[in-house]
Amino acid sequence: MNKITTLFQNRQRNIVSIYFTAGFPQLNDTIEIIKELQINGIDMIEVGVPFSDPIADGKVIQASSYKAIQNGMNLKILFKQLEAIKSKIQIPLIIMSYLNPIIQYGFENFCEDCHKIDISGIIIPDLPFEEYINEYKFITDAYDLKMIMLISPKTSEERIRLIDSNVEGFIYMVSSAATTGIQESFDEQKQEYFRRINSMKLRNPRLIGFGISNKETLTVALENASGVIIGSKFVSLLAEENNPKKAVQKLLAELK
């Protein structure tokens, strides 16, 4: 069974998923970061593929992408790194990438290689939903990859229900229609959006991302979702500490 499915079926508490950019701060940090996150009880990990034009990302993740590219990170290297730790990772791994690097690699080749190294899901923020359904869903299904779709405050109820009925795994609730980034708190408008989606009683569990950075934002998000995704905050700590173990410990301390 897919590890994402197993995680949500067996969960005893809210899910915490962490995002980081592969190849940042250093090219070979990927393995250590994943190991440290798993050791410290993180439920799921999103590994970002660096891209030169990351339109959905704020300054922190953009900067990490540029640095990772300078370090030499690409999909081929990432797959080699993940292959090396495949047998030691029990939690779900998700690859987050813009469409261009995947097309360059070959979409089916990408999915096949993800399957070989036990990747559970993929997120492609610039892949239109209709294009996914018409051109790519049969491929991801063939390799047991959960396609994680994003929704935002601007996504209509009709579209949310359409997404919910056509995907499995979980739905990624973006806390704002802007780019990723760190927020100290969620205003009433964002909280109303969380409550609105919660009241829709969707089939899929939902994780809230974009802006989770401290105990306050974590608590508010968990009131209206099955878990959270933390990205910019962790990437900024990786940049600050330049030490994966210290960055993980500092993140967990700030969320308590």
UniProtKB/Swiss-Prot annotation:
Top-rank taxon: Bacteria
Record flagged with keyword Cell membrane: no
Active-site residues, record numbering mapped to chain: E46 (proton acceptor), D57 (proton acceptor)
Pathway linked to the protein: Amino-acid biosynthesis; L-tryptophan biosynthesis; L-tryptophan from chorismate: step 5/5
A GO CC term attached to the entry: cytosol
Enzyme Commission number(s) of this protein: 4.2.1.20
Molecular functions (GO terms): tryptophan synthase activity
Catalytic activity, as annotated: (1S,2R)-1-C-(indol-3-yl)glycerol 3-phosphate + L-serine = D-glyceraldehyde 3-phosphate + L-tryptophan + H2O
A Pfam family recorded for this sequence: Trp_syntA
Keywords: Amino-acid biosynthesis, Aromatic amino acid biosynthesis, Lyase, Tryptophan biosynthesis
NCBIfam families: trpA (TIGR00262)
Function according to Swiss-Prot or TrEMBL: The alpha subunit is responsible for the aldol cleavage of indoleglycerol phosphate to indole and glyceraldehyde 3-phosphate.
HAMAP family, A to Z: Trp_synth_alpha
Record family assignment: Belongs to the TrpA family.
Assembly, per entry: Tetramer of two alpha and two beta chains.
Protein name, as recorded: Tryptophan synthase alpha chain
Gene that this sequence comes from: trpA
